[in-house]
Amino acid sequence: DLGPLIKENKITETVIVQAADTVAETDFILDIARQTPYVKGVVGWVDFEDSNVKSCIDRLSQNPLLKGFRPMIHDIKDVNWMLKDTLTESLDYLVKKGLSFDALVRPNHLKNLLVFAKKYPDLPIVIDHIAKPVIPKGEIDEWLKDMSALASLDNIWCKFSGIVTEIGENYTKGQIVPYVERIFELFESQRIMWGSDWPVLTMVES
């Protein structure tokens, strides 16, 4: 399904990011990547608290297309999950393996994410979906303050993605522009990744 869209939009390389919190999903998308020339990277999932997580990371990273992992933080009930000491060994291992950490978070996670990013200064961290600010309600001030603090750290990148998916189909350009402008002011082009959020995007847009 993606192939024709890639060609039509003159996109030459893509990264697949996991959509389910299972290692089986990571194996599945790594297999797709092996067979698909334009897929240049995969961001998968592991259970960072599993006693065998390091061996799992070792196995998955035998495929050089594995670039990092994304825990589904926005679905984890414990808002302080990322600060747990039980994660330290596995996160230090990500650094050792040269892998990244995608932070799928909401605005209420950002203060903890700042503490987390300072705790692991050598871990490359990507904030997904600009941290999902509540754009329809115009909630920008606290989000902007927290994102500004994060942008001051060298190990933080921001993924420009998922914006219209979060708003829904009844959105206007005027709603989005203030957030877009702030992100580009904070991170500039060098630390911004564009993500299509495809196929989830097709729920609201082409």
What feature does the model see in each segment?
Residues 1-28:
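An N-terminally biased module of ancient metal coordination in phosphate/nucleic-acid-related enzymes
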Residues 1-2, 25, 52-55, 110-113, ...:
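Alpha-helical scaffolding within the catalytic cores
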Residues 24-40, 123-127, 176-185:
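Short, electropositive alpha-helical surface patch
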Residues 38, 65, 122, 152-155, ...:
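Glycine-centered tight turns that cap/initiate beta-strands
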Residues 134-136, 140-206:
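H/E-rich (His + Asp/Glu) clusters that bind or coordinate divalent metals
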Residues 7, 49, 65, 85-86, ...:
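A generic "structured core" feature
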Residues 22-109, 115, 157-163, 170:
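Active-site gating/metal-coordination segments in enzymes
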Residues 19, 46, 130, 196-198:
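Active-site metal-binding loops of divalent metal-dependent hydrolases
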